Amino acid sequence: MSLNPRDVVIVDFGRTPMGRSKGGMHRNTRAETMSAHLISKLLERNPKVDPAEVEDVIWGCVNQTLEQGWNIARMASLMTQIPHTSAAQTVSRLCGSSMSALHTAAQAIQTGNGDVFVIGGVEHMGHVGMMHGVDPNPHLSLYAAKASGMMGLTAEMLGKMHGISREAQDKFGARSHQLAWKATQEGKFKDEIIPMEGYDENGFLKVFDFDETIRPETTVETLAELKPAFNPKGGTVTAGTSSQITDGASCMIVMSAQRAQDLGIQPMAVIRSMAVAGVDPAIMGYGPVPSTNKALKRAGLTIADIDFVELNEAFAAQALPVLKDLKLLDKMDEKVNLHGGAIALGHPFGCSGARISGTLLNVMKQNGGTLGVSTMCVGLGQGITTVFERI
């Protein structure tokens, strides 16, 4: 395919192994250290990329306090081979933060404001809890439903509106673990996981090159035994059908097509379109529907043109209505989250957008796909989507 000089291409992608936030492999590793290790190793893997050419390190992170405060992008960048003459910024769109980081870099490239960017994100939910230091304005309840800030209840609401049964959610949750375990066993994550030192359950230092979050023993029957996590009376959303609380980071090297050509680099993919959209915060999980429809329209495509989709699995009760209204339910086993998703791998907020996008590119490569969509819902009612074409 022919590319325009200012087209945005993905050169490479890597991520850390996903660690459990409670006593997991990353319990003694700080978020900046995790991020810096990932950036350094990805640059080492791409010797044609000169770190001095990096215009900006754009890093997603939601809870920007404690070790994740004071512009963690810059903190991490200073710990890598990227010189201090390159800039760095931290961005937040809650769950969509690192996909927003990608979009910010892409928009800069498209407008001639840089050629080489490092993007990604991190969330160490074991060290910085998701509600640490958060003080929501009580007056928000005058403008949005009081439960809009309680993600599990918004998932309950969306599931009820779309008639999603408890059994359907349990099946989706079990599918995530089974597919993630299958991908692990078959080495499908090998290209994306960059090994990291961490600590096992006995406190011994070792190198991890796998996700410790996957539970291969998960079945529909075991999930059916769990109690509702958010609505004790009549609720259907459980811990087993919700994204796991985990620690992790993800990273991409992004370039203009012209610079990649000049350097003799074969990119993984080109960005065809991007979009964000808002929805009622009470049904925040529905955001991927309008954002994906908008992105597809901008690319001149329909959902039928798309070979593979990565949808962030915030909750099964949220993912299934999205797939239903995107006309993907009957194509799920062929196209959607073929390596599992956040129910098995977890959802470290700042990490997930780049993580699902990179996993999508590997799924496309492994299965011969050409067009792919990565999309996710965002707390307080947003959706964000990227359409990629594999090169």
From Swiss-Prot:
GO annotations of cellular component type? cytoplasm
GO terms (BP aspect): fatty acid beta-oxidation; phenylacetate catabolic process
For the protein in the UniProt heading, the enzyme class is transferase
- Molecular function GO labels: acetyl-CoA C-acyltransferase activity
Q: Which reaction does it catalyse?
A: an acyl-CoA + acetyl-CoA = a 3-oxoacyl-CoA + CoA
Subunit structure, briefly?
Heterotetramer of two alpha chains (FadB) and two beta chains (FadA).
Q: What is this protein called?
A: 3-ketoacyl-CoA thiolase
Q: What is the source species?
A: Pseudomonas aeruginosa (strain ATCC 15692 / DSM 22644 / CIP 104116 / JCM 14847 / LMG 12228 / 1C / PRS 101 / PAO1)
The root-end lineage is:
Bacteria, Pseudomonadati, Pseudomonadota, Gammaproteobacteria, Pseudomonadales
